[in-house]
């Protein structure tokens, strides 16, 4: 993926799962990566691993529900690497899984703060920089839950529906500029989130056999592809990694 070489990617939720895999993939393709997450020790370790392999990486603690934290991430990208070319809005939570009538109002609100405000704050901080630079790609991690409600996931369903709308709005506002916004619905991925889902025992997703979950490398590679010119036709859209045609275009299957 030559389009990633020497470019700079900001990745939120980069301490584990899809975020960590994306940081490693982008770095392996020659990109500078800025890892952001609440757990500093984990992202520092990944950044050190990348640097040890000859890559360029920086890490910074960030709570995406706080705009000042997100702005600080962009400032680090500016100072360390000269700007931001790609923003991967990956940070998100699925806790607390609960039926509406027994849900915790504070936990529900916190999930919205992270899953929705976090995406908005990332866009708010990155778009002025991308517009000034004349290019840039934002990939927002979406979900089939945006359009297909699942029991016990009212907070997650609502937040991912909001992310889908924000993705489309951002792309409309980018207009005919080289910049674009796109969503990726990865499907079920072998991450810690699936452990929480299975433990809940609520809705059909919790009953899935772990063998059906795709590895984190798949969405990481799909995100890399979405940042390139071959995926420009999907701007403003929500791309599903369940689609075999998409998997072929990414190079995941023959």
Task: List PLM regions with ranges.
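The beta1-alpha1 cofactor-binding region of Rossmann-like NAD(H)/NADP(H)-dependent oxidoreductases
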Residues: 41, 61-73, 105
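Conserved glycine-rich cofactor-binding loop
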Residues: 15-16
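Residue(s) in the substrate-gating loop at a strand-loop-helix junction
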Residues: 143
């Amino acid at each position: 993926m030559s389009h990633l070489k020497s470019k700079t990617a900001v990745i939120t939720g980069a301490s584990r799962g899809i975020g960590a895999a994306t940081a490693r993939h982008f770095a392996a393709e020659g990109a500078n990566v800025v890892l952001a997450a609440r757990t500093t020790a984990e992202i520092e370790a990944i950044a050190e691993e990348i640097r040890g392999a000859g890559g360029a990486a920086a890490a910074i603690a960030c709570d995406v529900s706080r705009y000042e934290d997100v702005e600080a991430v962009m400032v680090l990208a500016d100072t360390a690497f000269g700007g931001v070319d790609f923003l991967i809005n990956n940070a998100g939570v699925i806790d607390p899984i609960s039926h509406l009538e027994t849900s915790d109002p504070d936990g529900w609100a916190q999930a919205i703060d992270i899953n929705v405000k976090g995406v908005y704050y990332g866009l708010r901080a990155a778009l002025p920089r991308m517009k000034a630079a004349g290019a840039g790609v934002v990939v927002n991690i979406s979900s089939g839950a945006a359009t297909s409600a699942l029991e016990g996931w009212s907070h997650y369903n609502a937040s991912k529906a909001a992310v889908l709308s924000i993705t489309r709005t951002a792309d409309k506002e980018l207009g005919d500029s080289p910049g674009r916004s796109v969503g990726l619905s990865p499907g079920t991925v072998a991450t810690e989130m699936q452990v929480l889902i299975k433990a809940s025992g609520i809705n059909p997703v919790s009953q899935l056999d772990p063998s059906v979950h795709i590895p984190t490398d798949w969405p990481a590679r799909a995100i890399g592809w979405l940042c390139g010119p071959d995926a420009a036709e999907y701007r403003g859209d929500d791309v599903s990694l369940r689609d075999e045609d998409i998997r072929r275009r990414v190079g995941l299957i023959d």
